[in-house]
């Protein structure tokens, strides 16, 4: 990207943009919700489309001059439907949280009962956390993982559904490493007369690549972000049955949003086209292969992985046996060039600002070209940093920079 105009007009911001580029180039990104967009996606985000206001939907706008963005938004809609095999797609949500909000507002009334995954067990804020709008407006009942297997206990989900008669069941997670059983969720929803919404924000790219089962055939609504494993711009997407299209669209606009971000919608269209390419399947396969290998390499070095491994792009490391908190590990690894995030683990005893674990994902490093053979070195540096946390870690930082130089970024 050419930032000569920013460099000329605002040197202070330009310098910080360049500083962030160096941070990304010299470090290993293991935050599971992050990825690296293509130059094409980035160019769409910075295009002339940012100048256009376009309240409404294609061919039904409240402003004039929308004939070009109408075409772009329709292309994005059509590509999303093709990519996921959906009957209807809304590409306007500014975020995954707003996608979830729109579905809730479309089918629920304040106080209605909803069944969702507990945040501390791997769910998301918008799945009923009391500090989030979802937990404040609706009566969320939480399910979690089994204490022994650390996997979702579907019989317990069924029991809670029968006891509480939710109007909506929410499946999906932000920190769950196993394949989600969508047919089982559908079966439970049907048994109690509930609607089913799947939040696939973390696994959308894996679903698109065919390496994770699709929730679309089993769900009334599917929400996602476009910037995690899908490798697109920051934004949201909703897929649903055609019979819900009108009420869903009304709850995005004018329900919770005004004008859509047409430059971001264009970038979504580009990312959907990239995900429709056969090479994206290889990418998805490599993400999972790298993740499984990194988990195994850490297990071999004495780390406890929640549920014993992973089936997707993410896993949690329970650090209780390493005598270090998630907060401390996050800062420590950052100092040697590895970026992770602190994360609660099942049956957490510490504050969410401290935590007993870290979350690790391989979507970004796989985009960058890291392969299975690189995982042993990453695991070794993580292990050595934590085991020798009070020593000189400069050699570890050099090892990470050497590894990053093998896989250049935005050169």
From Swiss-Prot:
InterPro entries from the UniProt entry: PyrdxlP-dep_Trfase, PyrdxlP-dep_Trfase_major, PyrdxlP-dep_Trfase_small, Ser_HO-MeTrfase, Ser_HO-MeTrfase-like, Ser_HO-MeTrfase_PLP_BS, SHMT-like_dom
Annotated GO MF terms: glycine hydroxymethyltransferase activity; pyridoxal phosphate binding
Keywords annotated in UniProt: Amino-acid biosynthesis, Cytoplasm, One-carbon metabolism, Pyridoxal phosphate, Transferase
Coiled coil: none
Compartments, record wording: Cytoplasm
Enzyme class (EC, first level): transferase
Binding site for (6S)-5,6,7,8-tetrahydrofolate: 119, 123-125, 351-353
Protein family (similarity comment): Belongs to the SHMT family.
PROSITE patterns xrefs: SHMT
Gene3D superfamilies the record matches: Aspartate Aminotransferase, domain 1 (3.90.1150.10), Type I PLP-dependent aspartate aminotransferase-like (Major domain) (3.40.640.10)
Lineage per the UniProt record: Bacteria, Bacillati, Bacillota, Clostridia, Eubacteriales
Name the UniProt record assigns to this protein: Serine hydroxymethyltransferase
């Amino acid at each position: 990207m050419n930032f000569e105009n920013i460099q000329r007009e605002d040197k202070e911001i330009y310098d910080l943009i360049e500083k962030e580029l160096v941070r990304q180039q010299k470090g290993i990104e293991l935050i599971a919700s992050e990825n690296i967009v293509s130059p094409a996606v980035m160019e769409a985000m910075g295009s002339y489309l940012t100048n256009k206001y376009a309240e409404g939907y294609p061919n039904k706008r409240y402003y004039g001059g929308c004939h070009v963005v109408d075409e772009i938004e329709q292309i994005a809609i059509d590509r999303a439907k093709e990519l996921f095999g959906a009957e209807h797609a809304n590409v306007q949500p500014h975020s995954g949280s707003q996608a979830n909000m729109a579905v809730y507002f479309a089918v629920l009334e304040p106080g209605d009962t909803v069944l969702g995954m507990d945040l501390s067990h791997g769910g998301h804020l918008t799945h009923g956390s009391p500090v989030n709008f979802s937990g404040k407006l609706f009566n969320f009942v939480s399910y979690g993982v089994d204490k022994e297997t650390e996997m979702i206990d579907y019989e317990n989900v069924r029991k809670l559904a029968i006891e509480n008669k939710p109007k909506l069941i929410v499946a999906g997670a932000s920190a769950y490493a196993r394949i989600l059983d969508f047919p089982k969720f559908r079966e439970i929803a049907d048994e109690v007369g509930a609607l089913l919404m799947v939040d696939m924000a973390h696994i959308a790219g894996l679903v698109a690549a065919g390496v994770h089962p699709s929730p679309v055939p089993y769900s009334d609504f599917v929400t996602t972000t476009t910037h995690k494993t899908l490798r697109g711009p920051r934004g949201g997407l909703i897929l649903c049955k055609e019979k819900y299209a009108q009420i869903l669209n009304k709850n995005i606009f004018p329900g919770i949003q005004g004008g859509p971000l047409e430059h971001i919608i264009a970038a979504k269209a580009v990312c959907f086209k990239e995900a429709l390419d056969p090479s994206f399947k290889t990418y998805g396969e490599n993400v999972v292969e790298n993740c499984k290998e990194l988990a195994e390499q850490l297990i071999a070095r004495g780390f406890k992985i929640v549920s014993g491994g992973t089936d997707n792009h993410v896993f949690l490391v329970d650090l209780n046996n390493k005598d270090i908190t998630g907060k401390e590990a996050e800062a420590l690894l950052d100092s040697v060039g590895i970026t992770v995030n602190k994360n609660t683990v099942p049956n957490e005893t510490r504050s969410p600002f401290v935590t007993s674990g870290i979350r690790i994902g391989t979507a970004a490093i796989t985009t960058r070209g890291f392969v299975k053979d690189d995982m042993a070195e990453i695991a070794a540096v993580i292990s050595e940093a934590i085991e020798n946390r009070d020593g000189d870690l400069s050699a570890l930082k050099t090892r990470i920079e050497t590894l990053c130089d093998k896989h250049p970024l935005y050169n």
